[in-house]
Every structure is written in structure tokens, then in C-alpha cells.
């Protein structure tokens, strides 16, 4: 019986296909166009599939019988307790064959009804291919030896345990089984303890400090001890470091002793320039920015050779740093060239109550050639607190000489001028009147007996000698009143006078009276 039903179904399908072909032929003859005939023949394949669906939809319930729901597990068979089909379930089906008209080809699907697709139930597996979906895969890493040997499931922890540590072996595995087998084989052959599995959240190590602690030599006691505040964890904005703590006398004595005893061993980012009374720092690329800032505040720097990103001077005063940046971008063609900062500075002066005078600087910026460091020698350091005033006078005299030498230079560009700092660079053109006035104003304000924050007869005597050598004159109303008159260098008692013990009796700075030849 089932074979007869299949044959009848095939017969109906073939009859529908035959009617479809005849309709196409009649349409082609009616239009007289061979192109439409070819087009319709070309679309024969999908129409066959639609005809099959149509044929399946025209079967009567007597021809197609659905298997009723089973009440017990086992082989599918008809349930004798349930009716095979009810009259209300019978669908009205067209039994007679309707001829196909040419107008049917203009209707959707050529007039052939398409049965609706059944909705898939939730119990049916999805039909789409899920082979392209990528599922997360965890790799496992075996660190065979070292202080943090074990099995890890995170590459970051593995890298922390191996990066920078010599002689540590590690390997990646796809599964924990392979990793455990390899780890056990290694520990068995080496006769060591079994390696533990260390999940990501339980790894107690830090990538930077771990490798650095193993490879770096032990720290020497306070060889490069930083003074002042601790180095910030991240580079602060300029507004956050504008109120830097004042340097104390103990800080200065420490830095003075450090630069005097430095012999060039253990640090290639700096070298020293040594004189009889004082030694100065020369900082090269990759120098410690905090060290540079503290030496700058102490007035103990001669030259800085910064990197292209100027990281070495990032803690210097903002106006000085901005002047250096403008020099790189506006004053030289090749911004990748190395530059230098040549500094002539005084040193701080203290009283009983604290800092009285901050250093004053004259800074020259220029393009640096190849740096040839001088040999650093360990010098004798026997400075005492009572010697600081004499040292301040000595650096003050050198500062005045450097400032007056600007009068001999005819091509200068002033990059920045402030109350206590002048930054300049060489220029290809003559010094303009605006820059010349800025230099003269700075000289008149700074060159006086109050250069160090208090009236110093030794400074006045030095200024008199310099000005008289140039044919000019210098007058100080303190000296004219008889407070302190120095007749010659041998009778110089300035350093012995020293700064006042308190700030309350410090007199204001004097504007010296000089002839025009002094600042020409």
C-alpha cells in the first residue's frame, strides 16, 4: 500500500512539472521572445522545488497519515485507543486540476502557494553550524625552576616569574593534564618537590620588583640617597610641584659632601667638575630627575645634557623648562639635536630661622656636540657650617663675573628672565634692544651688596674692583655710611660678618649707583 501511495505522489509531481513546462512554452509562443523562453527555462530548477512543495500540500488526508502521539516508549505504531483522524482535522484540498494561465507568472511564486514553514520547537537542536564560534581557551604554563616555580594559568604571572631572571625554564601547554605531566616528569628527574598549581588570583609576585630584585646588586647604604620629598609614583603636573620644599642646610651639606667624594664609579649618568673649594655636578642623559632638582636647588650644577624628551629636567621650575622647550622648537632647525644647559649659580644662605636666600642662576642653552666627560676625582671634604658664608661669597663673585660677561656678547637672545633667573642662548643676529634692556635690568637688580640676601662688604668690594677695571664707578650707601668699607682684598672681612641671625633685621636689596660704563 505504501508503494502505491509513493507512486501516486510521484505521478502528481510529474504532472505538475509537465503542466509547468507547457505553460512556459505557451507563454514563449505568445510573446514571441526567445529570451524570455531561455529565462524561464533557466529558472526551472527552483520552480521544481516549489512544485514539489505544492504537490505535498495537495495530498488528501487519506494519502498522508501522521503518526499519532505515543503513550508508551517503544517502536512507533498506531495507537488503537486514539482515532487516526477526525473530520475537523481534514483540510480542504483542490481535487481537480486547474489549468495554468499566463497571468499566473506575474504573481508571486507564479501563483503556486507555498506552505508555511513550521516553527522549530525548543527541544529541536539548532540547524545552524556552530563550528565557527570560538570558545575561550586557557593555556597553562609550567615554570620548571626558579624562586617562583609552579604551574600558572595566566601569562602575566608567568612573565613576572621568568622575565629578566637568568636560567629559568618555562613552557606552554594546551591542557592542565599535559602541564601536570610535564611538571611531574621534571620534578621526578630532578628529585625535587612537586610543583603546585598557582591560579591567577593567588600569584603573589610583581613583574617589576621580582626580576629587578634578583638581577640587581644589593644597594649600597645611602650612596645615592634622595633628599627632600619622596619621588612621586607618576610624573606630576607642574602645578603639583610648584611648591617644592625648601632645601635645608643639612640637605646642602649632604649634597656638597656627595659631589666632593664622587669618583665616577657606579654611575655613568653624571661626572663632576672639581675645584679647590667646591665640586659641581654635570648630568648626562638618563640622570635621575629628582637628583637634578635637588642639585639645582642647592646651586651645585655646572652643566645638564638632557635627553630629547627632557625627562632629566622635568622637576625644574616650570618657566625654565618651558624656555628650554621653546628653544628646541623655535631656535634650532633640527629638533632632534642634543642640547646643553650651562648654569652659573650662587648657593643658598640660611639663618637661624631657616632659608634666607635661594640661589640665583644665569643659564645658557645651546646645541651640544659630543660630550667628553672629565675625570671625576674624589676630593677632600672638610666643610663646616661656619665655612658656608665664605663659600657663598666665592660663588657670588663667580656669578657676577658670568653675568657681566654678557656685555661682551653682541648676539644674544633672551629666552626667559625672572627675578632671580636669566635664561639666554646665542643668536645669529645682533641682540635686539628689548633683550638688551632685559639684561641691563637684571644686572642692576642683582649686582649689589645684597646679592646673597644680606649686605655683604666682600661682595661690594669685589664689585668696586670689577667696575673700576672697566673705568666706571660703584657706590653703596651702606658702605658710604661707614657700616663696612673694604680697602683691599687682604682686608676683606666680608665672610666673617656673615648673614644676620634673624630675618627681621635683613635690609632690602639696594639698587647700586654705577656709571654707564658698567653695563655697556
Swiss-Prot record:
Protein's UniProt keywords contain Lipid metabolism: no
Keyword Protease belongs to the record: no
Protein name from the UniProt record: Transactivator/viroplasmin protein
Function: Enhances the ribosomal termination-reinitiation event leading to the translation of major open reading frames on the polycistronic viral RNAs.
Domain of life of the organism encoding this protein: Viruses
GO cellular component, one term: host cell cytoplasm
UniProt keyword annotations, A-Z: Host cytoplasm, Translation regulation
Similarity field: Belongs to the caulimoviridae viroplasmin family.
Coiled coil: none
Other noteworthy facts: The inclusion bodies are the site of viral DNA synthesis, virion assembly and accumulation in the infected cell.
GO biological process, one term: regulation of translation
Major location (coarse): host cell
Location of the region described as Disordered in the Swiss-Prot/TrEMBL record: 103-126, 487-520
Pfam families in the record: Cauli_VI
UniProt cross-references to InterPro entries, sorted A to Z: Ribosomal_bL9/RNase_H1_N, RNase_H1_N, RNase_H1_N_sf
Organism of derivation: Cauliflower mosaic virus (strain Strasbourg) (CaMV)
Cell compartments where the protein resides: Host cytoplasm
Amino acid at each position: 500500500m505504501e508503494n502505491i501511495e509513493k507512486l501516486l505522489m510521484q505521478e502528481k509531481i510529474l504532472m505538475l512539472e509537465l503542466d509547468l513546462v507547457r505553460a512556459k512554452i505557451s507563454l514563449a509562443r505568445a510573446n514571441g521572445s526567445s529570451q524570455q523562453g531561455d529565462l524561464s527555462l533557466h529558472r526551472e530548477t527552483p520552480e521544481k522545488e516549489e512544485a514539489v512543495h505544492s504537490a505535498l500540500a495537495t495530498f488528501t488526508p487519506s494519502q498522508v497519515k501522521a503518526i499519532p502521539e505515543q503513550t508508551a516508549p517503544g517502536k512507533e505504531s498506531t495507537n488503537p485507543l486514539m482515532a487516526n483522524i477526525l473530520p475537523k482535522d481534514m483540510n480542504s484540498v483542490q481535487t481537480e486540476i486547474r489549468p495554468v494561465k499566463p497571468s499566473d507568472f506575474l504573481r508571486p511564486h507564479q501563483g503556486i502557494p507555498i506552505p508555511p514553514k513550521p516553527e522549530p520547537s525548543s527541544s529541536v537542536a539548532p540547524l545552524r553550524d556552530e563550528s565557527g564560534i570560538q570558545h575561550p581557551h586557557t593555556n597553562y604554563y609550567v615554570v620548571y625552576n626558579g624562586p617562583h616555580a609552579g604551574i600558572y594559568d595566566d601569562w602575566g604571572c608567568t612573565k613576572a616569574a621568568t622575565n629578566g631572571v637568568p636560567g629559568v625554564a618555562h613552557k606552554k601547554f594546551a591542557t592542565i593534564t599535559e602541564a601536570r605531566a610535564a611538571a611531574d616528569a621534571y620534578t621526578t628527574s630532578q628529585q625535587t618537590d612537586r610543583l603546585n598549581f598557582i591560579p591567577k588570583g593567588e600569584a603573589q609576585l610583581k613583574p617589576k620588583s621580582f626580576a629587578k630584585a634578583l638581577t640587581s646588586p644589593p644597594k649600597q647604604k645611602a650612596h645615592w640617597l634622595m633628599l627632600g620629598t619622596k619621588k612621586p609614583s607618576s610624573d606630576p603636573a607642574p602645578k603639583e610641584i610648584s611648591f617644592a620644599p625648601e632645601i635645608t642646610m643639612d640637605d646642602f651639606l649632604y649634597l656638597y659632601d656627595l659631589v666632593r667624594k664622587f669618583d665616577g664609579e657606579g654611575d655613568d649618568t653624571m661626572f663632576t667638575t672639581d675645584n679647590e673649594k667646591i665640586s659641581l655636578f654635570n648630568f648626562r642623559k638618563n640622570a635621575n630627575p629628582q637628583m637634578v632638582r635637588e642639585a639645582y636647588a642647592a646651586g651645585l650644577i655646572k652643566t645638564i645634557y638632557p635627553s630629547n624628551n627632557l625627562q632629566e629636567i622635568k622637576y625644574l621650575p616650570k618657566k625654565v623648562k618651558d624656555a628650554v622647550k621653546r628653544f628646541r622648537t623655535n631656535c634650532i632647525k633640527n629638533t632632534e639635536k642634543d642640547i646643553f644647559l650651562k648654569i652659573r649659580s650662587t648657593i643658598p644662605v640660611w639663618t637661624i630661622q631657616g632659608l634666607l636666600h635661594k640661589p640665583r642662576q644665569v643659564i645658557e642653552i645651546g646645541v651640544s656636540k659630543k660630550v667628553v666627560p672629565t675625570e671625576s676625582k674624589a676630593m677632600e671634604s672638610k666643610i663646616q657650617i661656619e665655612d658656608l658664608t665664605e663659600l657663598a661669597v666665592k660663588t657670588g663673585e663667580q656669578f657676577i663675573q658670568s653675568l657681566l660677561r654678557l656685555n661682551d656678547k653682541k648676539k644674544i637672545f633672551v629666552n626667559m628672565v625672572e627675578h632671580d633667573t636669566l635664561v639666554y642662548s646665542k643668536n645669529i643676529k645682533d641682540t635686539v634692544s628689548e633683550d638688551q634692556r632685559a639684561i641691563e635690568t637684571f644686572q642692576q637688580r642683582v649686582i649689589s651688596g645684597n646679592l646673597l640676601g644680606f649686605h655683604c662688604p666682600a661682595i661690594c668690594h669685589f664689585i668696586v674692583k670689577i667696575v673700576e677695571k672697566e673705568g666706571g664707578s660703584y657706590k653703596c650707601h651702606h658702605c658710604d655710611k661707614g657700616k663696612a668699607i673694604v680697602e683691599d682684598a687682604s682686608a676683606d672681612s666680608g665672610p666673617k660678618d656673615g648673614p644676620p641671625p634673624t630675618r627681621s633685621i635683613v635690609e632690602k636689596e639696594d639698587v647700586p649707583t654705577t656709571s654707564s660704563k658698567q653695563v655697556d
